[in-house]
Amino acid sequence: MIVLGIETSCDETSVAILSDGKILSNVVSSQIDIHKKFGGVVPEIAARHHLSNLPIVFKNAIDMANISIDQIDLISVTYGPGLIGALLVGISFAKGLSLRLGKPLIGVNHIVGHVFANYITYPHLKPPYIVLMVSGGHTEILLVKQDDEIEVLGKTVDDAAGEAFDKVARILGLGYPGGPEIDKLSKNGDENKFNFPRPMMDSKSYNFSFSGLKTAVLYTVQKFDKDNVPKEDIAASFQKAVVEILLKKTFKAAKDLNVNTIVLAGGVAANSYLRKKAQKLSEKQNIKVLIPPLEFCTDNAAMIAMAGYKLYKKGISSDSTLEAVPNLKI
């Protein structure tokens, strides 16, 4: 089965083609440089660029896969969560293509896409497994019981982890996006220099909170003269606190539920410190941890195509009434 995936939920325009779960093409056009000067994604600008980029990215994906559009068997598209204007561009394109080709359409939850990105690298992965889903907009611990049955065990009660990274990067005067900037800066810092709070880390629930940690960083920065802020040490200490919170909760969930596999998903899963610490804990606690390659952590259409492929095989599909749902939940 040849599946076309379309992803336009935020600031990446992406089209991918999979054949029975194997990637034939995965083209991503990023808008990071466009939004960098604004310090974040501007929804209207993002939507306009999706509109102009999508036909070009689509053609490139078809050419790279070396197929004709008539060979496409299924069209899979992100319908939420995300920016309403950006989502509508992808959905409208997918609907038009489905109508033109007479091929089935399936709407995919962007978060489920991130989870299912792991099937690309780990095709033998089977439920049940625990997911640490960490991105700019979402931080959740999920239990995948079946491909079409995912339970939210815990989530952030305020900022997402990626959002906290961006806000702390801004406090430190770093560029956008903040996650990679802090990751890079931390490599030259002392992670034990500042003992930042770990909100909710020892609570019985699997929920997270990062706003208090972010505020603690702000107060610490304000104690220093503007030109003498130890940015490397603050970044490293902050990053350590976030990762400890994330991993303690996730491994607790795996132990409590007697699930022996944890997978990482989402943009923050690209963080080198998180990846390293997750691997170390895996060996220490004898729980398997699967970490996606960097290109499948950030937004891409291959993950949407894979999710569509898996769910369509479960008998799930959409029709022409498919609409964008900006605040879509799992």
Swiss-Prot record:
Its EC number is 2.3.1.234. It comes from the Bacteria. One of its GO terms (cellular component) is cytoplasm. Its main location: cytoplasm. It is found in: Cytoplasm. GO terms for molecular function: iron ion binding; N(6)-L-threonylcarbamoyladenine synthase activity. Binds 1 Fe(2+) ion per subunit. Keywords: Acyltransferase, Cytoplasm, Iron, Metal-binding, Transferase, tRNA processing. Fe cation binds at H110, H114, D299. GO terms for biological process: tRNA threonylcarbamoyladenosine modification. It catalyses: L-threonylcarbamoyladenylate + adenosine(37) in tRNA = N(6)-L-threonylcarbamoyladenosine(37) in tRNA + AMP + H(+). Pfam families: TsaD (PF00814). Its cofactor is Fe(2+). Substrate binds at M133, V134, S135, G136, G137, D166, G179, D183, N271. Required for the formation of a threonylcarbamoyl group on adenosine at position 37 (t(6)A37) in tRNAs that read codons beginning with adenine. Is involved in the transfer of the threonylcarbamoyl moiety of threonylcarbamoyl-AMP (TC-AMP) to the N6 group of A37, together with TsaE and TsaB. TsaD likely plays a direct catalytic role in this reaction. Belongs to the KAE1 / TsaD family. This is tRNA N6-adenosine threonylcarbamoyltransferase.
